[in-house]
Amino acid sequence: MLHHIFQKVLLPAALAGTMLAGTSAPAVSLAAQAATQPDSYHDDWLHVNDNAEIVDKDGNPVWITGCNWFGYNVGSQVFDGVWSQNMHDMLRQIADHGFNFLRIPMSTEILLQWKNGDPDPATPKVNQYTNPELTEEGIEGGTIKYSFDIWNMAVKWCRELGIKIMIDIHSAETASAGHQVSLWYTDKFSTEDWCDALAWFADYYKDDDTILAIDLKNEPHGTADVKDQMAKWDDSTDPTNWKYAAETCAARVLEKNPELLIMVEGTEVYPKEGYDWTAPRIDYTTMTEYYYGTWWGGNFRGAKKYPIDLGKYQSQLVYSPHDYGPLVWEQKWF
């Protein structure tokens, strides 16, 4: 089977005090294991060992080949593209191309909708003629199912195809441009709402190892130009402190399911030596820059001094820097 690079680079962190680099000896393919028959033993949970390797229950390093499929975060109430293609066929294509891990962007809003059993704000964007399985009657042109029921059909099909799932909170509110919002909370949905949503999700699927991981928040970012919207990383309990928020939310999630991998992305900026988070972004008189900058979610300078601490669940932590190749923007390291 072809080995592909996971789109989001995974750097496991097995020790609370150390940022660890991933190793290069993955050995066991999840897809190959699951392809023979649907898993019914719920024993595919993953962990991180002291060598910063993601391993299975027997300590064997695993090879994760991932892709993303969005839609649930933007208001479609389903994967985008199901308005014209058959969802089951699309999932088969993902598996047939050798992918064994599917990262699915979500919003806090849609998880809370499902948690509370609220009706869909809009009919899921499903073509009921190409997706008769997603209708109440099971016929072409039928009544489209509730979005959570459709989601659970996707989970079932992924389980049968040997595809594992990681959701990420792409934004608090469901919106096509929600990823532009720098933090994990807004005026509409609080940090507590975010934690409640993910804790509910972890509890709901705690007996189903199709759901292997949660990426707590896509691309925390922001600069000192708007300080109350800047994700920072330090030892404070400030509402904008990403480290504190991530540890708090992870504790809620792992209380419900201690087997889940917890992905923690970085921030956008970090203060340079001699400065702190009160500094302006730049002094235009001297053109002095006070922060190290990088991609949204790609800055882990804070983790060196203030590593994420998940306590007894440290073996579930994966630092997940968000990085892009030169086709997006040429960088000096390419």
How does the language model describe each region?
Residues 62-69, 100-106, 110, 164-171, ...:
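Structural recognition of the beta-strand scaffold that forms the well-ordered cores
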Residues 1-13:
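Bacterial N-terminal signal peptides that target proteins for export
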Residues 106-114, 151, 155, 160, ...:
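Aromatic-lined carbohydrate-binding surfaces of glycoside hydrolases
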